């Protein structure tokens, strides 16, 4: 484990890409953020970086259709992947997204970890499980963030976290589960600590 702590508040937008072929060179370390279209992915990125509009939050889920890259430090990037599984998106587009997501997880050499965000009230939908499977198959560590934790009481929250921790045991990969709330800042420290540990190899060079 590294003791180097990155300052995520310095994160800035780098570039957008329609697919993996248009991404910048495959070097340094990238950490991907993935989740259903309404899981609160952009909100979590904004909370982590303490910037209100770093990642555009949208009232229309499924808005983030590009792969958006943000730079924390040189060689350290956060990648906001297109939200998946929104009903109002045409089937053809859904298939394209899923193909792009799968391709990115399997082929991107600099990808060091995946943060998968799920609404704590509706975790582990089919596509969430697919993402965990892909990540584990690609030997990538996963942090599952159960978002919108402020919507539940403390006891209901603990119960959901425990349930998800038990449900993911069959995946057998390096998967950690944490409750998260952008509203009352729950889980932000744990998210930052996990990212620090994933970025550590490039920082200690």
Swiss-Prot record:
Names of the cofactor(s): Mg(2+)
- BP-aspect Gene Ontology terms: division septum assembly
| Domain (EngB-type G) ranges | 27-201
Per the entry, what this protein does is: Necessary for normal cell division and for the maintenance of normal septation.
Q: Does the keyword rRNA-binding apply?
A: no
Keywords carried by this UniProt record: Cell cycle, Cell division, GTP-binding, Magnesium, Metal-binding, Nucleotide-binding, Septation
Query: What PANTHER family does the record tag this protein with?
Result: ENGB-TYPE G DOMAIN-CONTAINING PROTEIN, MSS1/TRME-RELATED GTP-BINDING PROTEIN
Q: Which GO terms describe its cellular component?
A: cytosol
What InterPro entries does this protein's entry cite?
G_ENGB_dom (IPR030393), GTP-bd (IPR006073), GTP-bd_ribosome_bio_YsxC (IPR019987), P-loop_NTPase (IPR027417)
Instruction: Name one molecular function that GO assigns to this entry.
Output: GTP binding
Q: Specify the protein name.
A: Probable GTP-binding protein EngB
The Swiss-Prot or TrEMBL record describes its family as follows: Belongs to the TRAFAC class TrmE-Era-EngA-EngB-Septin-like GTPase superfamily. EngB GTPase family.
